[in-house]
């Protein structure tokens, strides 16, 4: 008799969790998009216009913006469809696919390693983006870091679940996901070491334009679809409105 009650309770908990996740992802989407256009791209325009003049500065900023989109698009295209953390997959789909993989023992290691490497490649530019933004303005970097942290939650799930299904080992799934996540601070250090000798106002203007493009692409390609997938449409909209309001208030307070 208690089974229906337990099922109902579990269903309610699941709905609350997915609703909160949908709200959070909508919030993160708004933060990243609003930040991209109202702050990053605007900073890129102003910086490059001061150096090259209004017309050439606008051209350089626009090219930087779409250059960032092309860069993250190429990274996505180089990663196989199923193993790409940007691609949405249902749990049932992952379960069936991983069950088929577990039938062949030698493939288990490949599943683990490839999945971890894919997430590491994906996280690398995110760490670089956050760190370089912090070098210029910590007030820009903090919202970026928070938005990236939120969007990494479903991404981590999409990586750890297939590993768990492939190996049946929760610790292995956790540690491989954790190690692949370390690519972000590594990306920050390597990005700084490579770009440090060249950092000037022009480079920062280009970088901010590219960061804006990357963040807009990630928001539209990953966060918004994930928000719709995990919860109801209106929860996503509530999150979007709240995220824009918070960012607008934050920028007004900084003025």
Give each language-model segment a name.
Residues 1-10, 14:
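Single conserved hydrophobic/aromatic residue that forms the stacking wall/gate
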Residues 18-24, 48-63, 198-207, 230-235:
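Interfacial loop-to-helix junctions that mark the boundaries of transmembrane helices
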Residues 20, 220-242:
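Interfacial loop-to-transmembrane junctions
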Residues 26-43, 184:
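A generic, lipid-embedded transmembrane alpha helix
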Residues 36-46, 215-227:
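Transmembrane alpha-helical segments of integral membrane proteins
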Residues 78-111:
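Intrinsically disordered, low-complexity non-transmembrane regions of multi-pass membrane transporters
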Residues 99-105, 112-150, 154-167, 173-177, ...:
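Generic transmembrane alpha-helix signature in multi-pass membrane proteins
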Residues 248-255:
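Juxtamembrane boundary at the C-terminal end of a transmembrane helix
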């Amino acid at each position: 008799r208690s089974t229906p009650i337990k099922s109902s309770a579990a269903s309610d908990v699941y709905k609350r969790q997915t609703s909160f996740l949908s709200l959070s992802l909508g919030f993160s989407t708004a933060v990243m998009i609003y930040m991209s256009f109202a702050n990053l791209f605007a900073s890129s325009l102003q910086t490059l216009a001061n150096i090259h003049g209004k017309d050439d500065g606008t051209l350089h900023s626009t090219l930087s913006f779409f250059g960032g989109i092309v860069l993250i698009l190429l990274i996505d295209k180089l990663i196989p469809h199923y193993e790409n953390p940007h691609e949405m997959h249902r749990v049932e789909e992952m379960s069936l696919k991983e069950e088929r993989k577990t039938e062949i023992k030698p493939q288990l290691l490949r599943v683990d390693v490839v999945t971890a490497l894919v997430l590491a490649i994906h996280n690398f530019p995110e760490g670089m983006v956050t760190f370089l933004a912090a070098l210029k303005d910590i007030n820009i970097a903090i919202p970026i870091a928070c938005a990236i942290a939120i969007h990494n939650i479903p991404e981590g799930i999409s990586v750890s679940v297939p590993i768990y299904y492939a190996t049946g080992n929760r610790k292995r799934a956790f540690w491989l996901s954790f190690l692949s996540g370390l690519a972000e601070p590594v990306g920050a250090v390597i990005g700084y070491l490579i770009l440090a000798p060249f950092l000037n106002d022009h480079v920062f203007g280009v970088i901010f334009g590219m960061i804006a493009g990357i963040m807009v692409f990630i928001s539209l390609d990953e966060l918004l679809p994930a928000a719709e997938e995990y919860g109801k449409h209106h929860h996503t909209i509530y999150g979007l409105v709240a995220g824009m309001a918070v960012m607008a208030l934050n920028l007004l307070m900084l003025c």
